[in-house]
Protein backbone atom coordinates (compact mmCIF):
# COMPACT_ATOMS: atom_id res chain seq x y z
CA UNK A 1 0.00 0.00 0.00
CA UNK A 2 1.36 3.42 -1.01
CA UNK A 3 1.91 5.90 1.77
CA UNK A 4 -0.12 9.12 1.77
CA UNK A 5 3.07 11.16 1.51
CA UNK A 6 4.10 9.30 -1.64
CA UNK A 7 0.67 9.80 -3.22
CA UNK A 8 0.78 13.50 -2.44
CA UNK A 9 4.28 13.74 -3.90
CA UNK A 10 3.30 11.97 -7.13
CA UNK A 11 0.19 14.13 -7.46
CA UNK A 12 2.23 17.31 -6.98
CA UNK A 13 4.76 16.21 -9.59
CA UNK A 14 1.99 15.46 -12.07
CA UNK A 15 0.43 18.88 -11.53
CA UNK A 16 3.79 20.58 -12.08
CA UNK A 17 4.36 18.61 -15.28
CA UNK A 18 0.92 19.53 -16.61
CA UNK A 19 1.52 23.19 -15.76
CA UNK A 20 4.86 23.14 -17.58
CA UNK A 21 3.25 21.59 -20.65
CA UNK A 22 0.45 24.19 -20.58
CA UNK A 23 2.98 27.01 -20.31
CA UNK A 24 4.93 25.62 -23.26
CA UNK A 25 1.88 25.56 -25.50
CA UNK A 26 1.07 28.65 -27.59
CA UNK A 27 -2.54 29.76 -27.63
CA UNK A 28 -4.16 31.66 -30.49
CA UNK A 29 -4.91 34.40 -31.03
CA UNK A 30 -2.23 36.25 -29.04
CA UNK A 31 -1.52 39.95 -29.43
CA UNK A 32 1.39 42.08 -28.23
CA UNK A 33 1.23 45.87 -27.93
CA UNK A 34 4.32 48.02 -28.42
CA UNK A 35 4.84 51.67 -29.24
CA UNK A 36 7.14 54.61 -29.70
CA UNK A 37 7.13 58.30 -28.82
CA UNK A 38 9.48 60.77 -30.48
CA UNK A 39 9.72 64.48 -29.70
CA UNK A 40 11.70 66.95 -31.82
CA UNK A 41 12.96 70.52 -31.72
CA UNK A 42 14.81 72.41 -34.43
CA UNK A 43 16.22 75.85 -35.10
CA UNK A 44 17.39 76.76 -38.62
CA UNK A 45 18.32 80.00 -40.40
CA UNK A 46 15.74 79.21 -43.09
CA UNK A 47 14.17 82.67 -43.50
CA UNK A 48 14.96 82.71 -47.24
CA UNK A 49 12.71 79.68 -47.71
CA UNK A 50 10.03 80.44 -45.09
CA UNK A 51 7.16 79.91 -47.55
CA UNK A 52 8.22 76.25 -47.88
CA UNK A 53 9.99 75.42 -44.63
CA UNK A 54 7.74 77.29 -42.21
CA UNK A 55 9.12 78.93 -39.05
CA UNK A 56 12.80 78.81 -38.17
CA UNK A 57 12.09 76.96 -34.92
CA UNK A 58 9.53 74.38 -33.88
CA UNK A 59 8.67 71.93 -31.10
CA UNK A 60 6.55 68.98 -32.20
CA UNK A 61 5.68 65.32 -31.73
CA UNK A 62 7.43 63.57 -34.59
CA UNK A 63 5.83 60.17 -33.98
CA UNK A 64 3.39 58.78 -31.42
CA UNK A 65 2.50 55.19 -32.26
CA UNK A 66 0.79 52.23 -30.67
CA UNK A 67 1.50 49.03 -32.57
CA UNK A 68 -0.44 45.78 -32.35
CA UNK A 69 1.10 42.55 -33.62
CA UNK A 70 -0.82 39.31 -33.25
CA UNK A 71 -0.55 35.66 -34.17
CA UNK A 72 -4.03 34.66 -35.28
CA UNK A 73 -2.87 31.12 -35.99
CA UNK A 74 0.47 29.36 -36.23
CA UNK A 75 0.94 30.63 -39.78
CA UNK A 76 -1.09 33.89 -39.77
CA UNK A 77 0.22 37.20 -38.40
CA UNK A 78 -1.57 40.56 -38.33
CA UNK A 79 0.07 43.95 -37.74
CA UNK A 80 -1.60 47.37 -37.32
CA UNK A 81 0.23 50.66 -36.73
CA UNK A 82 -1.72 53.92 -36.44
CA UNK A 83 0.41 57.02 -36.01
CA UNK A 84 0.08 60.62 -34.87
CA UNK A 85 2.69 62.88 -36.44
CA UNK A 86 2.45 66.43 -35.19
CA UNK A 87 5.02 67.76 -37.63
CA UNK A 88 2.56 67.45 -40.52
CA UNK A 89 0.58 70.46 -41.70
CA UNK A 90 -3.14 70.33 -42.39
CA UNK A 91 -4.01 69.89 -46.05
CA UNK A 92 -7.30 70.04 -47.93
CA UNK A 93 -8.26 72.61 -45.31
CA UNK A 94 -11.84 73.91 -45.26
CA UNK A 95 -13.23 76.47 -42.84
CA UNK A 96 -16.97 76.96 -42.24
CA UNK A 97 -18.55 79.55 -39.97
CA UNK A 98 -22.04 79.85 -38.50
CA UNK A 99 -23.66 82.83 -36.84
CA UNK A 100 -26.34 82.97 -34.18
CA UNK A 101 -29.33 85.28 -34.73
CA UNK A 102 -28.90 88.93 -33.88
CA UNK A 103 -30.29 89.42 -30.35
CA UNK A 104 -33.60 91.27 -30.01
CA UNK A 105 -33.00 94.94 -29.61
CA UNK A 106 -29.61 94.70 -31.29
CA UNK A 107 -26.26 93.40 -30.19
CA UNK A 108 -23.49 91.17 -31.45
CA UNK A 109 -24.25 87.64 -32.69
CA UNK A 110 -22.01 84.72 -31.78
CA UNK A 111 -19.89 83.48 -34.68
CA UNK A 112 -18.48 79.94 -34.54
CA UNK A 113 -15.90 78.73 -37.07
CA UNK A 114 -14.65 75.20 -37.64
CA UNK A 115 -11.58 74.21 -39.63
CA UNK A 116 -11.19 70.66 -40.92
CA UNK A 117 -8.63 68.83 -43.02
CA UNK A 118 -6.11 66.02 -42.89
CA UNK A 119 -4.05 66.30 -39.73
CA UNK A 120 -1.20 64.26 -38.32
CA UNK A 121 -3.37 61.21 -37.53
CA UNK A 122 -2.73 58.50 -40.12
CA UNK A 123 -2.57 54.75 -40.66
CA UNK A 124 0.89 53.46 -41.44
CA UNK A 125 1.36 49.68 -41.58
CA UNK A 126 -1.74 47.48 -41.68
CA UNK A 127 -1.16 44.02 -43.13
CA UNK A 128 -1.75 40.28 -42.81
CA UNK A 129 1.07 37.76 -43.30
CA UNK A 130 0.38 34.14 -44.25
CA UNK A 131 3.27 31.64 -44.11
CA UNK A 132 2.99 28.66 -46.45
CA UNK A 133 5.89 26.68 -44.98
CA UNK A 134 6.35 25.02 -41.62
CA UNK A 135 7.99 27.01 -38.86
CA UNK A 136 11.62 26.09 -38.34
CA UNK A 137 12.43 25.24 -41.96
CA UNK A 138 15.43 26.98 -43.59
CA UNK A 139 13.29 28.33 -46.40
CA UNK A 140 10.05 30.22 -45.70
CA UNK A 141 7.46 31.53 -48.17
CA UNK A 142 5.03 34.34 -47.22
CA UNK A 143 2.06 36.17 -48.73
CA UNK A 144 1.28 39.64 -47.39
CA UNK A 145 -1.81 41.72 -48.10
CA UNK A 146 -2.57 45.24 -46.90
CA UNK A 147 -0.61 48.46 -46.46
CA UNK A 148 3.16 48.29 -46.14
CA UNK A 149 6.27 50.06 -47.32
CA UNK A 150 7.18 49.55 -50.95
CA UNK A 151 10.27 47.34 -51.31
CA UNK A 152 12.60 50.21 -52.18
CA UNK A 153 15.55 51.97 -50.45
CA UNK A 154 17.37 50.37 -47.53
CA UNK A 155 17.29 53.46 -45.32
CA UNK A 156 13.58 54.00 -46.01
CA UNK A 157 12.97 50.41 -44.88
CA UNK A 158 15.08 50.90 -41.72
CA UNK A 159 12.82 51.21 -38.68
CA UNK A 160 12.27 54.70 -37.28
CA UNK A 161 12.67 53.20 -33.80
CA UNK A 162 16.35 54.18 -33.90
CA UNK A 163 17.49 56.40 -36.78
CA UNK A 164 21.06 57.52 -36.11
CA UNK A 165 20.57 60.63 -38.31
CA UNK A 166 17.17 61.45 -36.68
CA UNK A 167 15.52 61.78 -40.12
CA UNK A 168 15.74 59.69 -43.31
CA UNK A 169 15.29 62.74 -45.53
CA UNK A 170 15.65 66.47 -44.95
CA UNK A 171 13.11 66.69 -42.11
CA UNK A 172 11.00 69.61 -40.93
CA UNK A 173 12.65 73.02 -41.19
CA UNK A 174 14.70 72.12 -44.29
CA UNK A 175 13.78 71.97 -47.97
CA UNK A 176 12.54 68.49 -49.02
CA UNK A 177 15.43 68.00 -51.45
CA UNK A 178 17.28 65.02 -49.94
CA UNK A 179 17.44 61.76 -51.90
CA UNK A 180 14.72 60.16 -49.74
CA UNK A 181 12.41 63.13 -50.37
CA UNK A 182 12.98 63.04 -54.14
CA UNK A 183 12.27 59.33 -54.54
CA UNK A 184 9.28 59.44 -52.19
CA UNK A 185 7.79 62.30 -54.22
CA UNK A 186 8.29 60.28 -57.42
CA UNK A 187 6.23 57.40 -55.99
CA UNK A 188 8.97 54.88 -55.19
CA UNK A 189 9.40 54.99 -51.40
CA UNK A 190 7.08 55.02 -48.36
CA UNK A 191 3.72 53.23 -47.94
CA UNK A 192 1.22 51.89 -50.45
CA UNK A 193 -1.68 49.43 -50.50
CA UNK A 194 -1.19 46.10 -52.24
CA UNK A 195 0.11 42.55 -51.90
CA UNK A 196 3.56 40.97 -51.89
CA UNK A 197 5.29 37.60 -51.96
CA UNK A 198 8.42 37.06 -49.87
CA UNK A 199 10.90 34.20 -49.71
CA UNK A 200 13.41 33.95 -46.86
CA UNK A 201 16.24 31.43 -46.74
CA UNK A 202 18.45 30.97 -43.68
CA UNK A 203 22.06 30.55 -44.74
CA UNK A 204 22.83 29.98 -41.05
CA UNK A 205 21.65 31.33 -37.70
CA UNK A 206 23.06 34.80 -38.46
CA UNK A 207 22.75 35.15 -42.24
CA UNK A 208 19.57 35.47 -44.28
CA UNK A 209 18.74 35.69 -47.99
CA UNK A 210 15.47 37.49 -48.86
CA UNK A 211 13.62 38.04 -52.14
CA UNK A 212 10.41 40.09 -52.31
CA UNK A 213 7.99 40.89 -55.15
CA UNK A 214 5.04 43.26 -54.71
CA UNK A 215 2.11 44.81 -56.60
CA UNK A 216 0.54 48.05 -55.34
CA UNK A 217 -2.12 50.63 -56.20
CA UNK A 218 0.54 53.25 -56.86
CA UNK A 219 -1.29 56.11 -55.11
CA UNK A 220 0.35 55.88 -51.71
CA UNK A 221 -0.77 55.58 -48.13
CA UNK A 222 -4.45 54.64 -47.57
CA UNK A 223 -5.51 55.64 -51.10
CA UNK A 224 -7.60 53.77 -53.67
CA UNK A 225 -6.34 53.06 -57.17
CA UNK A 226 -7.26 55.54 -59.92
CA UNK A 227 -6.58 53.53 -63.08
CA UNK A 228 -6.48 49.97 -64.44
CA UNK A 229 -2.75 49.52 -63.85
CA UNK A 230 -0.63 48.56 -60.85
CA UNK A 231 2.83 49.45 -59.59
CA UNK A 232 5.38 46.65 -59.24
CA UNK A 233 8.48 46.38 -57.10
CA UNK A 234 11.21 43.85 -56.38
CA UNK A 235 13.93 43.73 -53.76
CA UNK A 236 16.60 41.19 -52.83
CA UNK A 237 19.00 41.25 -49.88
CA UNK A 238 21.75 38.90 -48.76
CA UNK A 239 23.86 38.75 -45.60
CA UNK A 240 27.28 37.94 -47.05
CA UNK A 241 28.73 37.84 -43.52
CA UNK A 242 27.08 38.10 -40.08
CA UNK A 243 27.84 41.86 -40.20
CA UNK A 244 27.61 42.78 -43.90
CA UNK A 245 24.31 42.86 -45.80
CA UNK A 246 23.88 43.94 -49.44
CA UNK A 247 20.73 44.67 -51.42
CA UNK A 248 19.24 45.81 -54.71
CA UNK A 249 15.76 46.99 -55.72
CA UNK A 250 13.74 47.90 -58.81
CA UNK A 251 10.39 49.65 -59.02
CA UNK A 252 7.83 50.56 -61.70
CA UNK A 253 5.40 53.23 -60.48
CA UNK A 254 2.13 53.87 -62.31
CA UNK A 255 -0.19 56.86 -62.14
CA UNK A 256 -2.18 59.42 -64.09
CA UNK A 257 0.00 62.20 -65.49
CA UNK A 258 -0.85 64.93 -67.96
CA UNK A 259 1.01 64.33 -71.24
CA UNK A 260 0.68 67.08 -73.86
CA UNK A 261 -2.26 68.42 -71.88
CA UNK A 262 -4.11 65.09 -71.93
CA UNK A 263 -4.34 62.84 -68.82
CA UNK A 264 -2.36 59.61 -69.42
CA UNK A 265 -3.70 56.81 -67.20
CA UNK A 266 -1.02 54.43 -68.47
CA UNK A 267 1.92 56.52 -67.28
CA UNK A 268 4.82 54.59 -65.68
CA UNK A 269 8.14 55.81 -64.27
CA UNK A 270 10.97 53.55 -63.14
CA UNK A 271 13.75 53.47 -60.55
CA UNK A 272 16.44 51.16 -59.25
CA UNK A 273 19.00 51.17 -56.48
CA UNK A 274 21.82 49.30 -54.78
CA UNK A 275 22.83 49.41 -51.12
CA UNK A 276 24.99 47.88 -48.41
CA UNK A 277 25.03 47.88 -44.63
CA UNK A 278 27.50 46.97 -41.89
CA UNK A 279 26.13 46.18 -38.43
CA UNK A 280 22.74 47.26 -37.11
CA UNK A 281 21.39 50.47 -35.52
CA UNK A 282 21.93 50.47 -31.77
CA UNK A 283 24.32 47.51 -31.72
CA UNK A 284 27.66 47.99 -30.00
CA UNK A 285 30.43 49.12 -32.34
CA UNK A 286 30.27 50.34 -35.93
CA UNK A 287 27.10 50.74 -37.98
CA UNK A 288 27.37 52.02 -41.55
CA UNK A 289 25.00 52.26 -44.51
CA UNK A 290 25.32 53.44 -48.09
CA UNK A 291 22.88 53.50 -50.99
CA UNK A 292 22.65 54.80 -54.54
CA UNK A 293 19.26 55.43 -56.21
CA UNK A 294 18.45 56.42 -59.79
CA UNK A 295 15.22 56.71 -61.77
CA UNK A 296 12.76 59.04 -63.49
CA UNK A 297 10.26 61.41 -61.89
CA UNK A 298 6.47 61.33 -62.25
CA UNK A 299 6.23 64.12 -64.84
CA UNK A 300 5.64 64.11 -68.59
CA UNK A 301 9.35 64.83 -69.15
CA UNK A 302 10.41 61.84 -67.03
CA UNK A 303 13.42 63.75 -65.73
CA UNK A 304 16.24 61.58 -64.43
CA UNK A 305 16.48 61.74 -60.64
CA UNK A 306 19.41 60.51 -58.60
CA UNK A 307 20.38 60.21 -54.96
CA UNK A 308 23.22 58.99 -52.80
CA UNK A 309 23.59 58.85 -49.07
CA UNK A 310 26.15 57.40 -46.73
CA UNK A 311 26.10 57.33 -42.95
CA UNK A 312 28.15 55.87 -40.14
CA UNK A 313 27.75 55.66 -36.36
CA UNK A 314 29.83 54.17 -33.58
CA UNK A 315 28.02 52.94 -30.47
CA UNK A 316 30.29 53.03 -27.43
CA UNK A 317 28.86 51.18 -24.43
CA UNK A 318 29.55 52.56 -20.97
CA UNK A 319 30.59 49.79 -18.60
CA UNK A 320 30.50 51.71 -15.31
CA UNK A 321 27.71 50.41 -13.03
CA UNK A 322 27.20 53.95 -11.66
CA UNK A 323 26.77 55.62 -15.07
CA UNK A 324 23.27 56.86 -15.87
CA UNK A 325 24.09 56.56 -19.57
CA UNK A 326 23.86 53.25 -21.42
CA UNK A 327 25.92 54.30 -24.47
CA UNK A 328 27.29 57.27 -26.40
CA UNK A 329 27.01 57.30 -30.20
CA UNK A 330 28.54 59.86 -32.58
CA UNK A 331 27.19 59.67 -36.14
CA UNK A 332 27.74 61.38 -39.48
CA UNK A 333 25.69 61.45 -42.69
CA UNK A 334 26.09 62.95 -46.15
CA UNK A 335 23.18 62.99 -48.61
CA UNK A 336 23.24 64.25 -52.20
CA UNK A 337 19.94 64.57 -54.05
CA UNK A 338 19.50 65.62 -57.68
CA UNK A 339 15.91 66.15 -58.95
CA UNK A 340 17.05 66.46 -62.59
CA UNK A 341 20.49 65.30 -63.68
CA UNK A 342 20.15 67.15 -67.01
CA UNK A 343 19.94 70.53 -65.30
CA UNK A 344 22.92 72.23 -63.70
CA UNK A 345 22.52 73.98 -60.39
CA UNK A 346 19.64 72.04 -58.79
CA UNK A 347 21.56 69.51 -56.71
CA UNK A 348 21.23 69.66 -52.89
CA UNK A 349 23.72 68.36 -50.33
CA UNK A 350 22.78 67.66 -46.72
CA UNK A 351 25.47 67.16 -44.08
CA UNK A 352 24.41 65.90 -40.64
CA UNK A 353 26.61 65.45 -37.60
CA UNK A 354 24.95 63.81 -34.59
CA UNK A 355 25.84 63.00 -31.00
CA UNK A 356 23.53 60.43 -29.46
CA UNK A 357 23.11 59.61 -25.78
CA UNK A 358 21.45 56.29 -24.94
CA UNK A 359 19.60 56.51 -21.63
CA UNK A 360 18.84 52.81 -22.13
CA UNK A 361 18.68 50.46 -25.10
CA UNK A 362 15.17 51.83 -25.81
CA UNK A 363 15.54 55.54 -24.95
CA UNK A 364 17.79 58.00 -26.76
CA UNK A 365 18.51 61.72 -26.86
CA UNK A 366 20.24 63.08 -29.95
CA UNK A 367 21.50 66.51 -30.91
CA UNK A 368 22.48 67.19 -34.52
CA UNK A 369 24.02 69.98 -36.53
CA UNK A 370 22.65 70.05 -40.09
CA UNK A 371 23.82 72.03 -43.11
CA UNK A 372 21.87 72.00 -46.38
CA UNK A 373 23.57 73.59 -49.38
CA UNK A 374 22.53 74.03 -53.00
CA UNK A 375 24.31 74.42 -56.32
CA UNK A 376 24.52 77.93 -57.69
CA UNK A 377 23.98 81.06 -55.65
CA UNK A 378 21.04 79.83 -53.55
CA UNK A 379 21.50 80.51 -49.82
CA UNK A 380 22.26 77.51 -47.63
CA UNK A 381 20.41 76.47 -44.47
CA UNK A 382 22.06 75.39 -41.24
CA UNK A 383 21.02 74.83 -37.67
CA UNK A 384 20.35 72.38 -34.87
CA UNK A 385 17.89 69.51 -34.51
CA UNK A 386 17.27 67.50 -31.33
CA UNK A 387 15.23 64.36 -30.74
CA UNK A 388 14.12 62.53 -27.60
CA UNK A 389 12.87 59.05 -28.50
CA UNK A 390 11.47 56.14 -26.49
CA UNK A 391 10.39 52.65 -27.58
CA UNK A 392 8.31 50.42 -25.34
At which residue positions do the language-model features occur?
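Cleavable N-terminal export/targeting peptides
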Residues: 1-26, 169
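Outer membrane beta-barrel
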Residues: 26-46, 53-221, 226-230, 237-246, ...
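Surface-exposed beta-loop-beta
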Residues: 203-204, 208-305
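A short, acidic, flexible beta-alpha connecting loop/helix-capping segment that sits on the rim
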Residues: 256, 369-375
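Extended hydrophobic-aromatic, low-complexity segments
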Residues: 285-288, 299-302, 320-329, 341-344, ...
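Hydrophobic, well-ordered secondary-structure elements that form the walls
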Residues: 312, 332, 355, 367, ...
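C-terminal closing repeat unit and adjoining cap/tail of repeat-based domains
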Residues: 352-368
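Outer-membrane beta-barrel "beta-signal"
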Residues: 380-392
